[in-house]
A protein has these predicted regions:
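One-carbon transfer enzymes
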Residues: 1-165
Length: 165
């Protein structure tokens, strides 16, 4: 049986990507292989992490392409050319439109740094999520893995892990 071909979309340092690479190397991820890393930031350290692991990389710059539609179409072209089965958003700082998400139903996963439905949705990403949680005074936070749909952080929840503050 062929392994599921995974693309990881990133924007920054790639700590979540590194965790996925390590899980693949140790055999925790055994039914899939990270075949491609795509970044919307040409300076993302995640690209270096991928290169060290021998994973193909691509950069798609929305500013250069001029529109969200052109940006997403380019990503879809790359995904299709690489025969990608599953897309993982790991610190990808761009919201994908319905145009994109409907092309990959239940094939896009996101790692969100809170226990959805808290501190999620448009504008809640990266450190802002943690800052808001601390400012609100929550005693427990965590992370959520969910399917991506047209609603930011609105897809079906697959896994949550809580962490005490």
């Amino acid at each position: 049986m062929d392994k599921v071909r995974i693309a990881v979309l990133v924007s920054g340092g790639g700590t979540n990507l590194q965790a996925l690479i390590d899980a693949q190397s140790s055999g925790v991820i055994s039914s899939g292989t990270i075949a491609l890393v795509i970044s919307n930031n040409p300076d993302a350290y995640a690209l270096e992490r991928a290169a060290v692991a021998g994973i193909a990389t691509e950069v798609v710059n929305k500013r250069e392409l001029g529109s969200q539609l052109a940006f997403e179409d380019k990503i879809m072209e790359i995904l299709n050319c690489n025969k990608i089965d599953l897309i993982v958003l790991a610190g990808f700082m761009s919201i994908l439109s319905e145009h994109f998400t409907t092309m990959y139903p239940e094939r896009i996963l996101n790692v969100h740094p809170s226990l959805i439905p808290s501190f999620c949705g448009k504008g809640y990403y990266g450190l802002r999520v943690h800052e808001e949680a601390l400012a609100y005074g929550v005693k427990v936070t965590g992370a959520t893995v969910h399917y991506v749909n047209e609603i930011p952080d609105g897809g079906k929840i697959l896994l949550q892990k809580a962490v005490e503050i």
